[in-house]
Structure formats: C-alpha cells, structure tokens
Swiss-Prot record:
Belongs to the universal ribosomal protein uS5 family. The lineage of its organism: Bacteria, Pseudomonadati, Pseudomonadota, Betaproteobacteria, Burkholderiales. Part of the 30S ribosomal subunit. Contacts proteins S4 and S8. GO terms for biological process: translation. This is Small ribosomal subunit protein uS5. It comes from Delftia acidovorans (strain DSM 14801 / SPH-1).
C-alpha cells in the first residue's frame, strides 16, 4: 500500500513532445504532530528524434507532482545522435549502484530493455536496441544511469575529430 504501480503511462500535450510517466511514489514526512503525506513522480519527455529529458516532481497531490516532473523534464533535455533508430556503439552508464549497458541492434530487433529504460528509448526515438541493467533496480537510478550512458555515446565524426583522422580512416583501421 506504500507504493503506486510503476507502470509507464502516456500523457497528452500539443507541443510535439512524447511524455511518459515512469513512477509515482507515496512519500511521508514525519513531524511532531504526525505524518505529512506527499507524492514524488518521475517522468521522461522526448521528441522522438534524438532529444530526451528527465524530471522529478514532488507535491501533496499526484497531478501536481506529475506536472512539476514534466516541466523539469522539458528543461533538462539533452541531444543524442542516433543511427537508423539505434545508437552508434556500445556504451556503459552508471549512477549510484545502478549500471546499464546499451548495445546497438539491427533493424527489426525492437527495444529489448527493462522498465524505466524502455520508456527513455521510446520517447527518444530509438526503435532497435539491446539494454541490460546491473545492480540497483530503483527507477530513478536506472534512468539516471541510462542518461549517463547516452551522454557518453559519440558519433564516428566526433571520434575522427578527436584522433585527427577522417571518418573513412576510422572505419578501415
């Protein structure tokens, strides 16, 4: 009874961004006069074309917490380069005790990922990926670890620029 279902839910808006609610938790603050109940919501927002953001909102009521989380998600968006609906290379990410490994997948594979990671990939616009999480299964830590991994992904042109070579040299070497 202390937790709500961590099912992912769609929320509708008209600005062209996809919104997913990952988790809503009931939280309590114990004071001298008793307990104060509140809610914490975790959401992700993306444009389906490589931009994604996450946010956490807290309030006394669920709708207000979700609204705050959605607004924070819109403010915290990052850009991720995609290649034909997947990522360019294998990346690892970590936050707290949660670590995730994201592997690119061929077309038709689909999103093979658990829980909170799946919601991030759906709003990001990734259609084919294989992801594995290790350690903590806390939704907040898993989403933060996924964002850490996505921030570490690079394009072949970025790798070539760092090495002072052309993109063709990177693939032939």
């Amino acid at each position: 009874m202390a937790k709500f279902s961590p099912k992912v839910q769609d929320e509708g808006r008209d600005d062209g961004l996809r919104e997913k609610m990952i988790a809503v938790n009931r939280v309590t603050k114990v004071v001298k006069g008793g307990r104060i109940l509140g809610f914490a919501a975790l959401t992700v927002v993306g444009d389906g074309d490589g931009r994604v953001g996450m946010g956490k909102g807290k309030s006394k009521e669920v709708p207000a917490a979700v609204q705050k989380a959605m607004e924070e998600s819109r403010r915290n968006m990052i850009k991720v380069s995609l290649k034909h609906g997947t990522i360019h290379h294998t990346v690892m990410g970590q936050h707290g005790a949660a670590s995730v490994m994201l592997n690119p997948a061929p077309k038709g594979t689909g999103i093979i990922a658990g829980g909170p990671m799946r919601a991030v990939f759906e709003v990001l616009g990734i259609t084919d990926i294989v992801a594995k999480s290790h350690g903590s299964s806390n939704p907040y830590n898993m989403v933060r670890a996924t964002f850490d991994a996505l921030k570490h992904s690079t394009t072949p042109s970025e790798v070539a620029a760092k090495r002072g070579k052309s993109v063709e040299d990177i693939f032939t070497a």
